[in-house]
Amino acid sequence: ELNSIKGKKVLVIGDVMLDTYHIGNVKRISPEAPVPVVRVTRTYNVLGGAANVARNLLGLGCSPYVVSLLGNDHNGNTMQEMFADLGIRNELFHTEHPTITKTRVIGNSQQVVRLDFETENECLNEEIEQKLLDAVKRALPEVDIVVISDYGKGVCNDTVCQQVISASAGQGKKVIIDPKGTNWEKYRSATIITPNLKELSAVSGMDVRNEDKEIHNAANRILKEYNLTSLLVTRSEKGMSYIAPDASQDIPTEAREVYDVSGAGDTVVATLAAALAAGIPIAAVSYTHL
């Protein structure tokens, strides 16, 4: 099954960001304020957000194609160089807003602080919106599946999501969505959405406990309300639940010690996209083994 994944073309549209890490040691407290002084010994950058989905797809042997926005700045140039080095095809359009950047300072293997560089509630103007949609429509004929990676930073607005879903359906392409927020009207008629338990509770308006029956009940309500084909609910240590009108399955996980959960949702959606692009049925997908 893994061999069938290799070479599958996956279109990823969403909010890309740069994750920067400063790693060092803490041996004293600052005399200026009661905070640790981190002596930095190493700094590195990682593709984040929708770009991390693409990086995961590449690791699985797929051929990702990214459509997104970048700031016309140093961090934007850094991201473009990283895409080029990895061989990830892309159409990245510049905006007047800075490239979304998350900077983490790690001292003695513990995160000390995270600095977020971004613009609140970035709204797309019509020109940029149309550029994104035109890029998607150009890419659609050659890809096997579509991922919308919504981090709530502006790329995945109502118009973009609905037009991507509609255009994909018109060409028989499945659309997988990693959602953000409770406005799921923009995801109407998607193939599969991958909320975590907290997101499922929020969008359903129910206090959903991490129990099979409660999750299935809430998910079935959402499927009907938004005309969705299926949901894959991630449930932390209890694994995942796949819910569709004609078939449902609870997929357990293997217990492992976890040091860092950041990017876990990106890994889920990338693995799911790769499997579906290869024609592997949901019921046959074991995320632990993939």
Which residues make up each language-model segment?
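Substrate-binding N-lobe of the ribokinase-like
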Residues: 8, 31, 35-101
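Conserved phosphate-binding/catalytic loop of the ribokinase/pfkB sugar-kinase fold
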Residues: 91-97, 104-140
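Short pre-catalytic strand/loop immediately N-terminal to key active-site residues, enriched for Gly-Thr
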Residues: 41-45, 252-262
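Short acidic, glycine-rich surface-loop motifs adjacent to enzyme active sites
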Residues: 143-155
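Conserved phosphate/ATP/ADP-binding segment of small-molecule kinases
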Residues: 153-248
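Structural motif
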Residues: 11-13, 114, 145-147, 176, ...
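Positively charged, low-complexity intrinsically disordered leader regions
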Residues: 1-27
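Conserved small/polar residues in nucleotide/adenosyl-binding loops
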Residues: 288-289
